[in-house]
Amino acid sequence: MGRFLLDSDIIIWHLRGREEVTEMLRDLQRFGVPGCSALSLLEVQLGVKKGEEERTNYFFEHLRVFDVNRQVASRAAQLIREHKGKGVTLDIPDALIASTCILHDLILVTFNRKHYPIKELNFYPVTIRS
């Protein structure tokens, strides 16, 4: 199994042809098949444009998709409560993705690190060249 969980933004950039992201995904495959949350699958498929369906479906067929189960939901709720107590709002989708990473010991691959102010998370160092 791959050690990486792809956030929705990474998947979208890849599917829209951002070569730097595609190269990064090729590099990550050396460690196994990356995964994504079922939530990311939903988010990406909601935004699919006409003509992108086949490529999108093919991409998801080659990822491990992690379900949002009871443990993931409970851990996400705990993260939201903990951060609310610190005056920080965590969005439900981000908390679910973060809890998936924490529970499965995965490294999150995202351009949106600011969405995940969670000390327990490990991030893959993603950069975009101008």
Q: Where are the regions that the model predicts?
A:
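Active-site neighborhoods of divalent-metal-dependent phosphate/nucleic-acid chemistry enzymes
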Residues: V65-F111
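A general structural signal for well-ordered alpha-helical segments in protein cores
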Residues: V21-T22, L41, E53-T56, A73-A76, ...
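General small-molecule cofactor/ligand-binding pocket signal
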Residues: G35, F66, Y124-V126
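Acidic, PIN/NYN-like endoribonuclease modules and their adjacent C-terminal/linker elements
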Residues: M1-R3, A98, I102-S130
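Structured helix-beta-strand junction loops
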Residues: R30-F31, H62-L63, K86, H104, ...
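Alpha-helix capping/helix-boundary segments
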Residues: I10-I11, S40, V72, L96-I97, ...
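Generic structural signal for small/hydrophobic residues in well-ordered secondary structure
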Residues: D7-S8, V44, A76, C101
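Short, well-structured N-terminal submotif of metal-dependent ribonuclease cores
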Residues: M1-C36, Q45-E61, R129-S130
